[in-house]
Amino acid sequence: MTPELRWLSDPTVFAVNRLDAHSDHLCCRTLDEAESGLTSLRQSLDGAWRFAWSANPAARPADFWQPDADLSGFGTIRVPGHIELQGYGQLQYTNTLYPWDGRSCLRPPQVDWNDDPVGSYVKEFDLDESLRGQRVCVSFQGVEQAMYLWCNGQFVGYAEDSFTPSEFDLTPYIRDENNRLCVEVYKRSSAAWIEDQDFFRFSGIFRSVYLYAKPRVHINDIWLRADLAADNTTGLLTPLVKLDGETDGASVALVVTDPEGYAVYEGPAAGDTIEIEGIQPWSHAAPVLYHAVLTLRDADGVLQEVVPYDIGFRRFEMINGVMCLNGERVVFNGVNRHEWNADRGRAIGADDMHAAMAVFKKNNINAVRTCHYPDQSLWYDLCDRNGIYMIDETNLESHGSWQKLGAVEPSWNVPGSLPEWKDCVVDRARSMFERDKNHAAVLIWSCGNESYAGEDILAMSQFFHDHDPGRLVHYEGVFHCRAFDAISDMESRMYAKPWEIREYLESHPKKPFILCEYMHDMGNSLGGMESYVRLADEFDQYQGGFIWDYMDQALRHTDALGRSVLGYGGDFADRNTDYNFSGNGIVYADGAEKPAMQDVRYWYDTPARRAAHDARNAAAAARADRDAAKAQAARKPGTLTVTEGDGNLGVRGDGFEILFSAGEAGPSSLTVNGSEWLWRAPRPAFWRAATDNDRGCGFPQKAAAWLAADVYLQNLGFAVLQKSADGVQVRYTYGVPTVPGAKAELTYTVEPQGTLLVEAVYHGVPGAPELPCFGVKFQTFAPVARTLWTGLSGETYPDRCKGGVFGCHEEVPHIEPALVPQDCGLHVGTRQFTLEQHNACGQTAAALTIEQADAPFAFSALPNTAQEIEAAQHITELPATGRMSVTILGAARGVGGIDSWGTDVEEPYRVSGEGEHCVAFRIVL
């Protein structure tokens, strides 16, 4: 057969000579190999390959696959790995718009032949001794996006589908030594129209490549269907085994052992259902796995292969419109997870997967959706072992073909009901199903993501239903096309508002409800999670959701000034792009947990454990309040010395001095034990740096007057209300330049007990826009090395604070490394905090403590002002000033999280500009 370039633009050609998909089992030569997890029947081809990159097909070295081809102009590339992360081609991130939008006028299934980069790979190798003399196949675990394959100058085959294995039989072409394997990888093909996921657009061989040998008779596929009877103690095991080769007279034996190593079944694997008594069911709470070992012998009784596989017995079904596992309702406390590494992109390793699983277990995450493609097989093994429920999603997304700039316009949607696309997408469903069907963790098959609906996706759903009665089928896209409601067994939506979900659940629906995506964690987000979790307590048919998403998709690179930074769309001269819209993770791109994670951990815990957490916090807060009251009562009054100048009022006490300035509209100096604490006079605070969610709902535009107010307050007067040795009280009044105008006041009372009471009041006016916050702000004169506080742990906001643990905490002041800097570091419900300055030896040189007056407050201590943060596009752009920006708030806007493109913060967490707001606190002098 002669390969043809036209295959790239023909959706009916997606596999040429590709072997049938099969289970992800490991074939070993001996029992010892099987127990070690290693096999002599495989040979890895990972590592360095010869490589040449071309901008388009016309520029490629078309005959590089010839045995005598001159490769002197080839470089090297790492496999697995992305071409674009190894110095070739153009990096690009885009969400829904196709990468070529505005540059090429295309419609499905067209390809721009002038802009379709090609990677030419060559691997030279000798066959391992353990593979010689047998049938040999090659497995490409992931190639993006279309590949042609040659071996020793002979064309072998062609394949698409970036995220499931493509395997080929090399037996007619391979020799023991001096083999040359050549792969031509195209970045774009007709498959590009249905691989329009919201991610960086890469190409190349990004998952492992290996050879495997098939003995005389070979276990080609297994399906160990491990069902559970209604009594939840009887396992129903149906071992289905497909052989190839010299199958006449061959036999397969099966041994199944329990977690303690005792055999629960020994006998043939003949396809009959085997009843096993005393089974421990598999679930998140108890992910019990049984160890199965298949042994294959040829007609002469000679051992040919041994296949180990861990299986879990469970029963997943719909009961009266509720999804149930082993007879009990299941609630998905889930997260969407892209495969990602900040240095390697989607070419992740085992270390990445183990790290992610540790985060899942620590934070009560019990479910994952493999958005929007099948993951590496190891991830499924880890989910089996750790009881993580899976929605396994087909590699299908055509978002840009039916939704343009937010508007639903499916006139040229693919695959739709187009017959030429049907086989292609059903094949993708089949490839995923065949590979992953043995995994207990996979409860639900998903037909893909954001591809509208039609007969083709209905055919995918029918395939899953026909082949696997033990699982359910998911697809959210029918929300936009109700004519195809039958595709999905459940009502699945993304970013539905809590009140919309309630309306659905109160309508007595036939289908249960899940959120396949919710809580869009872009930047500083995840506020209001309570509104969703409470639905699960109230409605049996609300069965949870999957946070969007697990990890920020950002790439570590060096910026124009030589600084290492996590880059996002646009940082790589990529256009079109969606900039930082890929930064939605509950962990940063380097794997560090975001502050919001403590609320994930709290809300994904059981109701009983949440109640116990709340009770502990309430008791700890009550103790702290009692201790603070005792400490305040124990303070002894002293004598104040007052000095009245022409423009300043000075107050001196035991170890402190304050200078109230009429001209600066506030205290210009606050020295405690000889250390100056004020860089400039404190001011009322009206602004926080906009968050991604703020920007998404247009809040900065609506509240822009408060940015001006935060910077350009008008000094309306300075009044001395009390002046004596027993106390001094002064008041500053400010004009707030909003429309309509408003007023604010700061009142300072120097108390003889050695404290400075600060009271801030904002007087609202009708028609004033909503506030980001209100309180008091100041900058310290010198750097602050450490902040200590009594209150809730971590970063907390009014709509994201339940996960905090009440107690005494500390941190080094910092800006959270969101892809685009934004407000961060707030601590609500604070009783007191201390700013520490350190000397060169790291010892405390000075400290300033601020405590609540009549009620807890919120505070932040950040190395930059709100305006500096607002102006930066990367954390490396923030100036190092040597000062600390301290803000104490009586009112603060929540961060929201329903979505990041239109929905405002929930009503209880907004700050009205029409009402009065105040905060009071004491500075201990």
Model segments located where?
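Accessory beta-strand-rich segments of carbohydrate-active enzymes
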Residues: T2-L19, C27, L31, E35-S36, ...
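Surface beta-strand/loop "capping" patches
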Residues: R216-G245, P595-R616, A629-G647, A760
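Low-complexity, Pro/Ser/Thr- and charge-rich linker/hinge segments at domain boundaries
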Residues: F206-W223, F313-R329, D625-A631, A785-W789
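Extended substrate-binding grooves/exosites of carbohydrate-active enzymes
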Residues: M1-G37, S104, W193, L303-D627
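Extended acidic/polar, glycine-enriched regions
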Residues: P172-N178, K242-I319
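Short strand-turn-strand beta-turns centered on an Asx-Gly dipeptide
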Residues: W150-V156, T257-P259, N326, D654, ...
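Beta-strand/loop-rich accessory regions of lumenal/periplasmic or secreted enzymes
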Residues: E84-Q86, Q92-T94, K187, S283, ...
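Beta-strand elements of well-folded, non-transmembrane domains
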Residues: W49, W53, L127-E129, G142-E144, ...
